[in-house]
C-alpha cells in the first residue's frame, strides 16, 4: 500500500506536535524490575512543520525552542535566528498538486515505514535500549487515519537489540539481557497546534509543577537568561465569562479536559 499526505497551502509553516508511543510492547524488551517498556509508554516527542523548498520539494523541519528571541527590533534577534537554522529532517518530492494548485501531495510511505527520530524512538532512548535500525523486511505500516486536527499512524517495527552490559538501570535503559529481535507496535500522533500559542505560566519552585526551560535573549539586555515555564493544560475561560473570571468567580473553561476510558 501507498500512503500520501495532501498538505493544503494553509498548513505550510504551521507547527505540528508529534507524540510517539509504544502501543504494544515487545516480549523480552524489559530487564527485570524495569519501569519502562510497556504499552502506552512515550518514546519520543517533536514539533515539526512542512515548508516548500526548491525544485518541487517539500521539507519537514524539526523545530527546537531551546533558544528564543521574539523582539524583531532587538539587535540580538537577527543573531539568534542566524545561529538557529532549524534542521531539515526529511525531504519529499511533490507527487501532485491540490485542487487549487496551491496544496501539495507527497508520498510518505517509506518515511513512516522506515527509521527516523521524528516518528519513532528518540536517539537517546533508542541508544539506551540498544536498538539498531529498523529491519524493513520485518516491519510494516498497520494504518494511517486522518481526523480534523490530527493524524494517527500505526506501525509494526522490528529492531535488532545488542547484548546488555553487566549492569543496567531501571528507568528506560537496559532492556532485556540478551540480543535478538524486538518487534513492537508503535503509534504516532500528529496534532495541529493552534495559531495563537497559549499564555505561558512561569515556573515558581514553591508550586509543584513540572517545567521546561529555554534560553531567552530578550529578557536581559545585558546578557541572556534561562526561563522556566510550567507544563499545564490550556484551561481558559470563555470570552463571555472573562469579566467574571477576573472578579474571581467560578466559571466553566472554554475547552474542558476530557478523559476517555
Where are these regions (language model features)?
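Auxiliary tRNA-acceptor-end handling modules of aminoacyl-tRNA synthetases
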Residues: 1-261
